[in-house]
Every structure is written in C-alpha cells, then in structure tokens.
Amino acid sequence: IVFGDWSSDVCSSDLMADQVAAGLGLRRNQVGVCSTGVIGLPMPMARIEPKLPELLASLGRDKGSDVARAIMTSDTRPKEIAISFDLGGTRVRLGGCTKGAGMISPSMATMLCFITTDVCIPHDALRKGVLEAVEESFNRITIDGDMSTNDTVMVLANGASGMTPIRRNGKRCRQFRAALRWLMLELAKSIVRDGERVTRFVTVTVKGARTYLDAKKVAEA
C-alpha cells in the first residue's frame, strides 16, 4: 500500500502503482494506492517520483506506528490497534490503523484504514468478513454529516502464522470474523472520539425494528 496525505487526487493511481511496483518487483495489481488531503489538487508526481527509491528503501517490520502518524491530516492523534489471539491452537496477529476526523458521512468518507493479519484465509471468506465488519463499524459512524469523494478500507492477510488454511464458514473463520469486527468497530469509534469539534460521543441503539434496513433508517434519521 502506498499513500499520500497532501492531496486526495486518486486519478494518478496507475502511475503511482507502476512506480512502486517496479521498485519492489511487483505487479501493478499488487499495489494499493490511497490519497487523502485537499480535494481537487493534482498529485505532485514530479516531486514524488524522485523520492520513491528512498521511500521504498525505508520499508520495515517495525513501521506500523509511523504509518499511523503519517496518514494523519486533521487528526490530533494516531489511531492504531493490534491484538494477538489463539485461533485453533495457533497464535495469530491482527492489527490496523485508521485516519479521519471530519467529513465522515455517509458510509465512511474521508477516511483510510489499513489492517494486516498473519491468518491464512481464503480470499472470498476474507472479503465477506471485511464487508460485514465495515457495514457494522465504519459505515455506521458520522461526525458532521458532510460527504466527501473517496475512502478506503484495506485488509491484507499473508498467512505467515503458519496455520492451516481457515475453512470457509468453519469455527475458526467465525472466530476470525468476530475479531475483525471488534477491531474495526474500535477503530471506527476512535475516529468519532477524535472528530473535529466533537464534544460528545453518542451511540444510537434501535430495538423492535422489523429489518436491519428499517433500524438503519431510524438510527440515521
């Protein structure tokens, strides 16, 4: 993942992905590009390209907190959480960071979230878990009702824990999804607590609704 926090221009992503992929020996589709900052400013690629070799050379396993600080814009503090837990007899890790403090509506907007795990999980099972977790966390928060142009939640799983692959819809898969939902919800709450001009943290709970969609409409009315 490569990101910039000066301009929210997402129209230079192919060029950025090509440059990073070439420097790391990857394919373009193995590079995720994210941008946040001022809307409408072109990405200054002429200034970025000469610095990419230096940036790529600084990659390291202990840079998670640096990432959490680097993606801050109007945030007043970094937002990061990391946990480890037993999953079917194997100790696994799950961690992530996020940024966002304003223009958080509707369904994410003006926020980035990067999550990594060493769990070995099929792509479709991970995707389903991510979509469910996002719906119950980042899609359910708002700070000021202002909308924005782009947002991203990325989850990367490398299987480095050495565990046997998770079976779709099995017990370990359900346990991992529960952990992922908890992590995303806590990260989402951290965005609200650090929101621009926020003085209160309010949780709305709807009971007795016939459907989830009905409850959602009532809560967001």
PLM feature spans:
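A structural-propensity feature for long, helix-poor, extended segments
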Residues: 140-156, 188, 202
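Short, charged, low-complexity patches
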Residues: 9, 13, 123-130, 173-180
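Short glycine-rich or small-residue beta-strand-to-loop segments that form or flank ligand, phosphate
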Residues: 7-8, 32-39, 95-97, 112-116, ...
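A glycine- and small/hydrophobic-rich beta-loop-beta segment
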Residues: 158-221
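Glycine-rich, mobile lid/loop segments that gate access to catalytic sites or pores
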Residues: 14-138, 143, 148
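Short, solvent-exposed loop/turn segments at secondary-structure boundaries
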Residues: 8, 43, 167-168
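Single conserved hydrophobic/aromatic residue that forms the stacking wall/gate
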Residues: 1-10
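Surface-exposed helix-capping loop/turn segments at secondary-structure junctions
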Residues: 11, 25-26, 193-195
